[in-house]
Design a protein with these regions (language model features):
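A structured beta-alpha segment of the ubiquitous adenosine-cofactor-binding alpha/beta core
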Residues: 44-104
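Rossmann-fold NAD(P)-binding glycine/threonine-rich loop
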Residues: 89-166
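Internal alpha-helical scaffold of NAD(P)-dependent oxidoreductase catalytic cores
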Residues: 12-15, 129, 148-181, 193-221
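Hydrophobic/aromatic beta-strand patches that form the interior of the parallel beta-sheet core
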Residues: 17-19, 66-68, 84, 112, ...
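NAD(P)+-binding Rossmann beta1-loop-alpha1 motif at the extreme N-terminus of oxidoreductases
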Residues: 1-43
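NAD(P)-dependent Rossmann-like dehydrogenase/reductase catalytic/cofactor-binding core
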Residues: 12, 173-180, 203, 208-314
């Protein structure tokens, strides 16, 4: 993940130093450095083939990235403008690295963990200034996926959260903020969907190829344009409520049960677009224009997949 983040920042014009936190001989470090830079060059070469930049620009981007050995970490961190920790998902290892970094950085520097699993408050106790610490979860490949999930802790200064949001927006990312909760937003939803897909293969519901086709051309197609909660509002929360009751009974599992918020919304008349509010508020929205915009985006998705076709007239 660290190498992908390095590409994202270097591509956006920032100088980046990746620090090797493991002690190595000079020869071992040289091998690691060559491997890291080679991977970055291959990444930029692929982006060049895809038309995002030209070879000269790729060289300029790679020139912004350096690799520092562990014995130079203190001096490197002392000059850092922002620190991302990206060591393996081991709590004590992360705490050790974060503690060491927080002792040598400028007191006004923001430190972020890129953990995908560990709660921010399980790490913040190792930080000298926990008010300037938060989790910043990237999705692989970090240099392509726009979304970045920001998870501040109990001690995180709200101004730091806003500063990180602005920084990420400045490099072309789309940040969202979520509470300190296991799984953030995407991994939590993703785990449910992936496990259900695997379960359907195991149950013989459909082949792996057809399930993936259903996701690409149905589920993913729709949700590239509409958010999950937005789509609930499109059809109405009542539809989800009754569909969930049927699935729970038919499949004999409470994993399909609608959460309490769905029935509360129904009781309060917050069904969705047809009542002017659901999870989102539509009261001041030009519904026809809004629908047209979303439907137009779906047409563009059809074109992207090569599935848009003229009507049959004969």
């Amino acid at each position: 993940m660290g190498r992908g983040i390095a590409v994202a920042f270097a591509y956006a014009g920032h100088n980046v130093t990746m620090i090797d936190v493991k002690s190595r001989s000079a020869e071992q470090f040289a091998i690691l450095e060559a491997d890291a830079l080679d991977e970055l060059r291959k990444t930029l070469a692929s982006l060049t083939r895809f038309g995002l930049l030209n070879p000269e620009q790729a060289e300029a981007v790679i020139a912004r990235v350096t690799i520092a050995p562990s014995d130079a970490s203190a001096a490197t961190l002392a000059k850092a403008g922002l620190v991302f920790e990206g060591v393996p998902e081991v709590v004590e290892l992360k705490r050790k690295v974060l503690a060491a970094a927080s002792r040598v950085v400028d007191p006004e520097i923001i430190i972020a963990s890129t953990t995908s699993t560990i709660l921010v408050d399980d790490l913040s106790g190792a930080i000298e200034k926990p008010e300037r610490f938060l989790n910043v979860h990237w999705l692989n490949p970090a240099y392509l996926i726009p979304l970045v999930e920001i998870s501040p802790g109990n001690q995180t200064d709200p101004a730091i959260t806003e500063e990180v949001k602005s920084l990420l927006e400045g490099i072309g990312k789309v940040p969202v903020v979520c509470a300190a909760t296991p799984g953030f937003i995407v991994p939590r939803i993703q785990a449910l969907a992936m496990n259900e897909a695997a379960r359907m293969v195991d149950e013989g519901v459909a082949s792996a190829a057809d399930i993936d086709k259903a996701i690409r051309y149905g589920f993913g197609f729709r949700y590239a344009v509409l958010g999950l909660l937005e789509f609930i509002d499109w059809g109405g929360g009542d539809i989800l409520y009754y569909a969930s009751r049927y699935l729970e009974a038919a499949l004999g599992s409470d994993r399909y049960r609608a959460p309490d918020v769905i029935s509360r919304n129904m009781q309060e008349g917050r069904i969705g677009m047809r009542t002017g509010a659901g999870f989102l508020d539509y009261s001041d929205l030009d519904i026809d224009a809004y629908r047209d915009q979303r439907l137009s985006a779906l047409v563009e998705m059809l074109r992207h997949f090569g599935l848009a076709r003229p009507p049959v007239l004969d």
